[in-house]
């Protein structure tokens, strides 16, 4: 059956004059054609994911390609049955990718147009995965890695991308003298991060050109050596990559069983992304810890209108109580 919706993933590092006004004009156009999605605009470029029917997405691509400096912008296209977004957002930011460099010194930031790692095709990246002397580094957030990753890739001990530069500095001796290749969802983070590694003194740095999204669509590699699914920042949450021998690597936060279903912790002040089944979500009140389960603003409890007696009953079923010492 034909899929009626297209999802466009794209980015481009290119100087944008009067980027705030550009963002406002861009939003107006997107709304005028009924496009949905999320786009970031900065002085350094544009980064977005949008969705719509064939006609709408074609109008959008034609419009973007008509803009000065964006004639060759590369759209990565997925075909889906449903919209990937509910609304349309275009926001101006200082950067389309924030590296978390010291003192938020934007003048000291990396310009990928001047410094970036060598581009690797999907075939070249697959060869790097099979090379025991090459370090493969995942540059995404921890919850993205936990849902799916390249076989043998290093999972940095970080919660989010902004912590990665410091982690690399702390572990520099482990791979300073080795070939390092990095990857991310669509390539936008790696453009900047690989450039940062070059500036830090790494001599042989590569990046997967077009990211995981391109690797999964390549007719030669067909996503092989990817385990699990790829996390995406839209209503789909997870998409397939490996079309040769797919596997599940995600594990339920509570019992460790295979799982590819993400929810946010019920405690709004925690909001951690956790993998869990619907059964365990109900059982543990969608709280990633006891503290989050009993938090007075637990969203799962309020959404399901649970009484205190019902909360106490569910806590008792897992050996907990309202007044026990909190454990994180």
Curated annotation (Swiss-Prot):
Q: Name one GO biological process term.
A: tRNA modification
Which Enzyme Commission numbers does its entry carry?
Answer: 1.14.-.-
User: Where, by residue number, is the active site?
Assistant: 184
| Family indicated by similarity | Belongs to the TrhO family.
List the SMART domains: RHOD (SM00450)
Q: Which GO terms describe its molecular function?
A: oxidoreductase activity, acting on paired donors, with incorporation or reduction of molecular oxygen
| UniProt-listed CDD domains | RHOD_YceA (cd01518)
Which PANTHER family does the UniProt entry name for this protein?
RHODANESE-LIKE DOMAIN-CONTAINING PROTEIN 7-RELATED, THIOSULFATE SULFURTRANSFERASE/RHODANESE-LIKE DOMAIN-CONTAINING PROTEIN 2
Which reactions are catalysed by this chain? uridine(34) in tRNA + AH2 + O2 = 5-hydroxyuridine(34) in tRNA + A + H2O
- This chain's source organism reads Streptococcus pneumoniae (strain Hungary19A-6)
Write down the SUPFAM superfamilies for this protein, in alphabetical order.
Rhodanese/Cell cycle control phosphatase
- What are the Rhodanese domain coordinates in residue numbering? 130-224
Name the UniProt record assigns to this protein: tRNA uridine(34) hydroxylase
Q: Which domain of life is it from?
A: Bacteria
Gene symbol?
trhO
Q: Pfam families, per this entry? A: Rhodanese (PF00581), Rhodanese_C (PF12368), UPF0176_N (PF17773)
What are the record keywords, sorted?
Oxidoreductase, tRNA processing
* Function according to Swiss-Prot or TrEMBL: Catalyzes oxygen-dependent 5-hydroxyuridine (ho5U) modification at position 34 in tRNAs.
